[in-house]
A protein has these predicted regions:
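Active-site hotspot residues in diverse enzymes, especially metal/ion-binding acidic/histidine motifs
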Residues: 1-166
Length: 166
């Protein structure tokens, strides 16, 4: 693993879009009083605060992942939450500003930001900032942990190549 962080966080998303998504994430974490990992995404979907969106049980998957994909459903639930927020006039009126329309890339970025908040990952001890450790601590796939580390300009394994569509 390369021990030197990148000079700048990397993302293909425009800075304004990233900033809006980060403000949205911080507002959600504050409203749900979530202060440590793992983010309770299933509870957030099932229990919308102040009626900001409608919880549709038919849209929420209760399938458990397994093996290397055991945390993939959490990312899917976070992406669903973004879509529900973006479709909700009440959420917009309540100050939860979701950029819309956005690319699939932006929705994936939201999911990673929500499940792996920047402040939390930066607060980890350096030995806990490995893809495998981040995966376990935040309950996300190792793949998404790698992408998030790269987005934040944190040390990455030297042999990791991140697809350009992320």
């Amino acid at each position: 693993m390369d021990s030197t962080p990148n000079a700048e966080p990397t993302s293909a998303l425009p800075p304004k879009t990233r900033a809006r998504i980060n403000r949205l994430v911080n507002a959600l974490l504050e409203r749900y009083q979530v202060t440590e990992p793992p983010v309770p995404i299933e509870r957030m979907l099932k229990q919308p605060l102040d009626g900001l969106w409608e919880a549709h049980p038919s849209q929420i998957s209760f399938i458990m992942g397994h093996g290397i994909y055991r945390y993939a459903p959490r990312l899917a639930e976070a992406r669903l939450l973004y879509r529900m927020l973006s479709d909700s006039p009440t959420a917009r009126e309540g100050g939860l500003d979701t950029p819309w329309p956005v690319s699939r890339r932006a929705i994936k970025y939201f999911a990673r930001c929500l499940l792996i908040p920047e402040e939390w990952i930066r607060a980890l001890r350096p030995p806990d900032r490995t893809p495998d450790a981040v995966s376990e601590i935040f309950q996300v796939t190792t793949y998404d942990a790698i992408i998030r580390l790269a987005e934040l300009g944190l040390p990455m394994p030297a042999d990791v190549v991140i697809p350009s569509d992320e």
